């Protein structure tokens, strides 16, 4: 079911098609996204900010797909040991590769959280709405990404491989991607802070 912003998700029949971008070779959702108890979403990309604006662009993409405020997104600096292996950083191609991978990973993460919320609240997932990571259902039922992540035992809700079954939102439902935003990398550069 495809719905407006903040509602539902869209399951696609990919016909066995490959996952987009770097998600093909880095399928583990928990390698890309982590939900911290303090209400922050940590996002890992294998691309390095070298002035092309990838940190800001990717943060906007993730915030759109998850229906969270851009201020909740924390981009984790790329490291060889912990980041998805996305090969080289090459200018605007980085947004195409990492951005598409994170768009699909975030869309699937959102659907996973909506399914978990539906089970926890005892309602149909399609009746739930997400606003800034808070999930609301009929009769004022509420939970959040962070509450669900905190109550998950073991490896967590995202400790699984991406499937390409959940399509990202259509461009018309995006509110942040493609809109000018303050660059996340500029303050560190201005104040000489290492990232």
PLM region descriptions:
Residues 1-195:
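Cofactor-binding beta-sheet edge motifs in enzyme active sites
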């Amino acid at each position: 079911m495809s719905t407006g912003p903040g509602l539902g998700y869209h399951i696609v029949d990919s016909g066995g098609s490959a996952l987009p971008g770097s998600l093909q070779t880095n399928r583990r959702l928990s390698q890309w996204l982590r939900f911290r108890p303090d209400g922050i979403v940590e996002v890992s990309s294998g691309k390095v900010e070298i002035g092309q604006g990838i940190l800001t662009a990717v943060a906007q993409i993730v915030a759109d797909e998850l229906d969270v405020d851009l201020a909740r997104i924390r981009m984790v600096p790329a490291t060889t040991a912990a980041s998805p292996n996305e090969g080289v950083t090459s200018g605007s191609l980085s947004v195409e590769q990492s951005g598409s991978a994170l768009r699909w990973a975030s869309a699937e993460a959102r659907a996973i959280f909506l399914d978990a919320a539906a089970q926890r609240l005892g309602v149909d997932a399609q009746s739930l709405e997400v606003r800034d990571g808070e999930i609301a259902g009929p009769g004022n039922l509420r939970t959040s990404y962070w509450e669900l992540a905190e109550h998950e035992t073991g490896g967590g809700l995202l400790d699984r491989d991406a499937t390409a079954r959940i399509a990202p939102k259509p461009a018309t439902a995006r509110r942040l991607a493609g809109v000018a935003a303050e660059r996340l990398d500029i303050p560190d550069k201005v104040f000489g802070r290492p990232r």
